Regions:
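Conserved SAM/SAH-binding loop
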Residues: 8-12
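A short glycine-rich, Lys/Arg-flanked "PGG" loop and its adjoining helix->strand segment in the class I
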Residues: 58-74
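A short acidic, glycine-rich active-site loop
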Residues: 48-62
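Extreme N-terminal starter segment of soluble prokaryotic enzymes
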Residues: 1-5
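A conditional alpha-helix N-cap/helix-loop micro-motif detector
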Residues: 6-7, 57-61, 144
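Class I S-adenosyl-L-methionine
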Residues: 17-27, 31, 35-49, 69-218
């Protein structure tokens, strides 16, 4: 199993990658939402630790989407509804249900859409509950950080052990941690040095953990 981490612009790096050189892209691109206004009316400020790195300033242009489609046969894009003009119209949707049967209101949204180009009969709904405003991880490093359990479920459902996964907007490295824990190779790219350092540390810590038997999703 290999891990490659690159600090820099993801588009510049992807332009050097051969066609279909990875097995899947799982990524959460910036949506271009104004952080001063918060998410879903919650009113978070850029003085919050999650906003200090200047995340979510611009939306990736069409070259980004052309390149992820070129380097990978399988695409999974969180917040895909923000990119309907950039992605292919024949895609499908995964649904991340953050609430399930629990009756509470999540100000960041009760569900999240993930655009994918996998076949329709493979699409699933994931119920990975984020109770309150905090993700399942003890430490939260990024404003849009996803639960490791969610990414692991997607990897087990749609990829194979030994596959290579690319995350062009690596953030705090959750996809990389999930790849280490499920025996996938990982290529992560992050332009922000602060988040890159966090991702590097988290992935290194995951590599030091003993390998546990995988729970294969049905």
């Amino acid at each position: 199993m290999t891990v490659e981490l690159h600090l820099g612009d993801c588009l510049e790096y992807m332009r050097t990658m051969p066609d279909k050189s990875v097995d899947a892209v799982i990524t959460d691109p910036p949506y271009g939402i104004n952080a001063d206004k918060g998410v879903g009316g919650f009113g978070a400020s850029k003085t919050d630790k999650h906003y200090q790195a200047g995340w979510d300033v611009t939306i990736p242009d069409i070259d980004y989407f052309d390149n992820i489609e070129r380097v990978s046969p399988k695409l999974f894009i969180f917040g895909g509804q923000f990119f309907t003009k950039q992605v292919q119209p024949n895609g499908h949707w995964l649904v991340w249900d953050k609430v399930g049967d629990i009756k509470f209101k999540n100000p960041f949204g009760d569900c999240e859409l993930i655009w994918t180009n996998v076949k329709r009969n493979s699409v699933k709904k994931y119920t990975v509950i984020q109770q309150g405003f905090i993700a399942e991880e003890k430490d939260r490093f990024h404003p849009t950080q996803k639960p490791i359990k969610l990414i692991k479920s997607m990897l087990l459902d749609y990829t194979h052990e030994g596959d290579t996964i690319l995350d062009p907007f690596m953030g705090s490295g959750t996809t990389g941690v999930a790849c280490v824990q499920t025996g996938r190779n990982f290529i992560g790219i992050e332009i922000d040095p602060t988040y890159f350092a966090v991702a590097e540390r988290r992935i290194q810590e995951a590599q030091l953990q003993p390998t546990l038997p995988l729970e294969v999703n049905a």
